[in-house]
Structures are given as structure tokens and as C-alpha cells.
Amino acid sequence: MGYPHLHQAVYSITKSVLEQLEIDDIEELKKNYNGYGSFNLPHFINFNEKIFSERIYLEEFAENVRKGERAGIGRALLSHGTIKDRTSRGKSQYSGSIFHTGHLLGFMLIGNLSGFNSRKTNIENVVPLTPWANGNGFKLNTDYGNSQRVYEQLIKNCITKASNQSETDFRVYYQVEAIYDNESEDVPRGILLQAVSNNKKYLRDIHVFIPNVKYGMNSSIDYTDWKLNK
């Protein structure tokens, strides 16, 4: 258990990252630290929060958009019909490195969607993430911190709750973006995770930045190449 405290959570932050998060400076970002390793951002960023009013009859889907040769963005429309009761199978570690095979769109949220490659070998959907950023927790604000896994579980739980209460049309528009400092780095500085639902009774808006960092005595990471981090 554990999570990066503020001084460790900002380790990955550069001027370029701040610009992509639409934050003026590091001190402003620090004000958005949620106390559990990640940052609750003040608004959506490059995200269609009006999708449910603009595209009423949109069907469930999942897609990836690359950033050059790297995994970039995952987008999906989620419902009870897309979620799965387990996580994906396959290799969980970048061999010989500190990194997990992190994903943009997690199997537990889109595992029942046919036509989408959710395997850990899909380079458009897999990025190197630290064990903390990838996450082990299941609830917000615990000793595990607020990692990507925690937000995925939160969304899944809300979809399940809505379904149990016969809200069969409950939908969540979900977007996950790997934020890099520059085009030459292949390890993301963090994950920008955003979600909006068609019923705020079950799920409120989410716009959070999860830094791809370590915590503890040795927090250094070389973001140029995952192979340099053993």
C-alpha cells in the first residue's frame, strides 16, 4: 500500500505537461492535489462533455488514437453491456523494467465489446505505468491512493448500481489520454482520465490527472525509454 505525496506527485510535471493540462504553473497544479497521489483538475480538457445531448442515439464503442508511434488516447461509450467481471489476462510487466503493462481502456470496462482488441499486446492501448499509477485499490481515498484502477472501479460500480436499479439506459462517455512531455519520450508523464454520464445521480463528472511516478526513497524515472528503468 502507499501512494505518492505531493512532492513526489509533481516529479513528472514539466512546462509541456502543464500546458496540456491547461494549468498555468506548478503552484496552481499543487492546489488541485487530492491528497491521494493524483490531481482533480478544475474542468474537462479536449473532451466532449455534451456528447449525450449532441449524439442521442450513439451506440457503445471503444477506440484508440495514436500519438505518432505511441499509444495516445482511448475513448469509449460504456454501459452495463460493455463491462466485465475480471481484469485482462497476459503479461503484466515490461520485461526487466519497473513498469506494468498499463492500459488506456481497461478490460473491466470494455471487455464485453466485440471488435476491440483489449489484449495487453495491443500497442495502441498499452503504456508503461508504474505499479502505483496502474493501481491496486478499489475505492477512493484509501491507503492505496487514487490510481487509474480506482477510478475504473468507481465507474464500473456506478454502472452496476444503475443496472441493478433498472436504469438500463445508463451510459458513461470515457476518455483516457497518455500525457507525454515531448515526441521523443515513450513513457507517459501521467494519465488524464475523464468521464461524463447521462445521469449525474449515479456518476458525477471526472477529470483527474494521475502522475506516472514512484513513491519512496528512490523516485527517479527516465521517461525517454522504458528500458532504461530497471
Segments (PLM) and residue ranges:
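Domain-level detector of nuclease and nuclease-like folds
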Residues: 54-230
